[in-house]
């Protein structure tokens, strides 16, 4: 491992240990972490995920059902993104000790696919149209008001590429449209020494996850991915919070796949010789070269968790930057305009509003296949956001700007999460 990366991770570990000792005896939960206030929301959805597009639809959420902590949520959206989802969350197998989550999603999306690396050309892209579905389940063992947790996670899914368009929106013929399926397992945990899991204002949180090796095809590599996420919360003024986030992801190849270009071309090529010699064939060969280069990199180094989208580097498309390693750090100031518990009960919603918030943020991220190259091409985002904190859910709207332009997004939960709907892990 590169000395600079080793030094960096050592400092993260030291900071985590110091945070644990410092906050464990000081930070008290400011409210019950197992919700009891029943709430429901029937709400229109007008969302946007950078690099995937916009969608509208309808969502339903029931929080703290039957006087307990369990939630149900469902959604239906259509537009650039076609998706349907259902989830049962925080079902207590053993009260306040063993918690079960399960969810199902199906989707059809037109993604934007770039070359790997921080310095990849933003104009050199292809647009795969992908459909699929997955069933996701998680068991969480929790202690001490959810301060200490371990989880096991399984995702059973399948997907296929329906078509691939070039940058001029011309479809390539001869694309493999067969279904791929598999089961993916993750193990992880968290140390949450904050005053509240949903809306923390002071303390620190450390999360880790390991996605276990899996491959769907004989020519693919097997590798596992370790993610580390450290977030600190410093109280400012009366209700405000200054938030710091540090994230590192590393893929470790355990069994290398095919790294011969000609062999991969036979399996994943775009059949460019069907086009007559000229611009169309040149465009096809260019797109094919990029596609195969990504396959080669993935087989040699694996793919760590990507940057870009709703969680990190918010001014870039979803999954914009990817490689064998990823490093991210950012800071966000959250102005809490109110600090209240205001009940509301209207025809389509009932619950408790606990805050309205403005935010300003700055982020920097980088990816590379080798540690020595990781700090070579950093990318930055900055912007502002608006949030509404309700009982059991946070709705946020962010505007972000970076080297490749601006993005807006309407999403749920705070940024810098380990998992999200657009990146379920």
Predicted regions and their residues:
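Membrane-embedded beta-strands of outer-membrane beta-barrel proteins
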Residues: 58-60, 74, 86-88, 137-139, ...
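Sequence/structural signature of outer-membrane beta-barrel proteins
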Residues: 63-67, 77-83, 107-111, 157-161, ...
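Residue-level signature of outer-membrane beta-barrel architecture
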Residues: 48, 62-64, 90-92, 139-145, ...
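C-terminal outer-membrane beta-barrel translocator/porin domains of Gram-negative envelope proteins
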Residues: 198-351
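Transmembrane beta-barrel strands of outer-membrane/channel proteins
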Residues: 46-48, 58-60, 72-78, 100-110, ...
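Transmembrane beta-strand segments of outer-membrane beta-barrel domains in Gram-negative
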Residues: 28, 110-256, 272
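Outer-membrane beta-barrel "beta-signal"
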Residues: 187, 386-392, 406-425
